[in-house]
């Protein structure tokens, strides 16, 4: 398994890797493609989840709403 420094990972990717999940596995659990998960993690697109997908995301990542990052990808330049 490729090793990443914590600072190299987006918040969503950190959570996914912590659960030993691939982008494909997370995408399948949420009913989206692997490319969609990749785009979320890289900050190329913003997740638009249905309530069912949102609940599933929390469940598969084993996190609470409070633990979910406000932004899944990398912070924008405006955020510092």
Language model features: what each stretch is:
Residues 2, 59, 66-80:
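Short, charged recognition helix plus adjacent turn
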Residues 32-47:
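Recognition helix of helix-turn-helix/homeodomain-like DNA-binding domains
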